[in-house]
């Protein structure tokens, strides 16, 4: 009698079910290369309690989680509990809980930043980042907080003084004890009721919430006073401040809605759209951000000789004057050029916009300043119907600033006079700031090269945000505070760049690079990114994809 032997389980290599072309291997090899080149970042700690979950297993695991839209610590814990093969490989079959994952994110933000910088350096060495043209853009990201849980400056000071005044007297006859009893037991009191009503009218529900928290115990009182101090440190004018995330600023988004947001600035390389630099700011506009971005780019690209392209939102005269003296070239449209482009796009994508305008409004639209073409050679403005505005001899001075004025004497007899001029002047005039530096920047933008560079800005700079929101499924910030938000967005940028690398570089190329680094390490000891400069190599490229690394 033959007995068939049955086996209900078998031991196998956990990675045998993963496809060789999987995105997992891009993450795996990139991290291995990073670890081989930066061993000092993974040295074992010499003091304190030894960590069970070391950064060399946690960093690739967290990055791989972001690649799969698994971001929160709880979701990451539930992910490996489902016995995913990729998690077993990266974690070496260990089982970190959500508290361990959160501890890693808090303690190793510098390691995450170093990995982000390494990805950019790797792109430069392999040709995935050209470094010659950078596109900068910014967007508002909604803070992880409720717009209605907020306080104004006067409400905050009133609440702070109230707590300081009454929290010192905690006897049974004191107001602090009676208020605690009122909120805990909801007992009606003729003495407390009018005070609470007055507080509700003054500090609203948000202030009452903080007051309730401070009444619990000594620890809660200390935490509330610390929260009030943090809110006070982030006061900006008369704008409201969120009590949930005080570092998120009250800004108006592109839809015209007010809310608590962060301003996220990103620089994208022109070659394949990799993010070269990014940071979070609390400012409500982009006007002074170009100089800040230059500092990040200079450090990461290792040079200041490149071109940065931005939109008119970055037009800030003092910043442009400083930038003009630097080796970095800027391509930026002036207000007139930006308005003309916006009108052309509106006409192309929203033709119904002009359907509801009267005949007079349509005629006035034709004679707006941006419809007058500037002839640099003859230094004149040419109107829609051929009218020429010449430059006046005298400069006009307003608030200490000199302006060139262009006008014509033919306005009185012109049939378009009612639509082209204003009633006060009855004459068409165009004023231009008399500034040689600004004129040089404008002419650089109007040149054929400037137009070609700016033409690609939308697909690169704004396309990066579209990729983050659509292809990368980024739906908003899930952390609070500038530091934590910046760490979260660093992981998001790493995810974006690694997917770009996976798209434009074959797995076998990454594997070859890792093998050569290990080989050089055995022969020469410690190595760094300079090893790419010592190699005699070239990449075989086919259809914008690096398919092979050839070493001489």
Language model regions located:
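Anion-binding and metal-coordination hotspots
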Residues: 4, 48-51, 57, 62, ...
């Amino acid at each position: 009698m033959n007995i068939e032997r049955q086996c209900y389980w078998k031991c196998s290599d956990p990675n045998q079910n993963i496809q060789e072309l999987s995105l997992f291997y891009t993450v795996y090899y990139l991290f291995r290369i990073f670890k081989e080149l930066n061993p000092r970042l993974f040295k074992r700690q010499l003091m304190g309690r030894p960590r069970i979950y070391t950064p060399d297993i946690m960093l690739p695991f967290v990055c791989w989680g972001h690649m799969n839209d698994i971001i929160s610590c709880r979701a990451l814990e539930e992910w490996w509990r489902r016995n995913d093969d990729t998690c077993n490989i990266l974690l070496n079959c260990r089982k970190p809980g959500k508290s361990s994952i959160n501890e890693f994110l808090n303690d190793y933000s510098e390691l995450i930043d170093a990995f982000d910088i390494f990805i950019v350096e790797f792109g430069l060495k392999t040709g995935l980042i050209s470094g010659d043209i950078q596109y900068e853009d910014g967007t508002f990201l909604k803070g992880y907080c409720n717009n209605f849980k907020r306080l104004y400056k006067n409400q905050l000071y009133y609440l702070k003084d109230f707590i300081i005044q009454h929290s010192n007297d905690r006897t049974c006859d004191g107001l602090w004890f009676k208020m605690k009893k009122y909120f805990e037991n909801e007992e009606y009191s003729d003495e407390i009721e009018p005070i609470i009503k007055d507080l509700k009218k003054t500090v609203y529900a948000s202030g009452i919430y903080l007051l309730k928290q401070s009444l619990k115990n000594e620890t809660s009182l200390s935490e509330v006073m610390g929260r009030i101090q943090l809110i006070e440190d982030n006061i900006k004018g008369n704008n409201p401040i969120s009590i949930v995330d005080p570092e998120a600023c009250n800004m108006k988004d592109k839809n015209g809605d007010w809310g608590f947001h962060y301003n996220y600035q990103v620089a994208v390389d022109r070659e394949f759209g990799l993010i070269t630099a990014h940071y979070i700011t609390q400012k409500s506009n982009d006007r002074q951000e170009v100089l800040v971005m230059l500092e990040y780019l200079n450090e990461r690209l290792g040079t200041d000789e490149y071109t940065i392209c931005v939109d008119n939102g970055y037009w800030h005269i003092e910043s442009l004057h400083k930038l003009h003296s630097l080796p970095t070239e800027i391509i930026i449209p002036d207000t007139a050029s930006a308005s003309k482009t916006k009108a052309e796009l509106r006409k192309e994508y929203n033709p119904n916009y002009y359907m509801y305008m009267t005949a007079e409004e349509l005629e006035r639209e034709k004679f707006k300043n941006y419809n007058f073409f500037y002839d640099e050679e003859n230094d004149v403005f040419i109107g829609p119907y051929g009218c020429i505005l010449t430059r006046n001899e005298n400069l006009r001075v307003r608030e200490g600033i000199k302006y060139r004025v262009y006008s014509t004497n033919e306005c009185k007899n012109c049939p378009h006079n009612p639509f082209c001029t204003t009633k006060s002047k009855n004459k068409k005039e165009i004023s231009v700031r008399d500034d040689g530096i600004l004129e040089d920047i404008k002419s650089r933008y109007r040149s054929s090269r400037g137009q070609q560079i700016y033409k690609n800005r939308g697909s690169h700079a704004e396309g990066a945000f579209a990729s983050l929101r659509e292809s990368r499924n980024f739906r908003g910030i899930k952390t609070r505070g500038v530091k934590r938000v910046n760490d979260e967005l660093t992981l998001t940028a790493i995810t974006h760049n690694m997917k770009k690398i996976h798209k434009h570089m074959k797995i076998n190329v990454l594997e070859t690079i890792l093998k050569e680094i290990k080989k050089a390490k055995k022969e020469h000891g410690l190595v760094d990114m300079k090893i790419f400069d010592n190699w005699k190599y070239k990449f075989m490229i086919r259809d914008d994809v690096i398919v092979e690394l050839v070493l001489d």
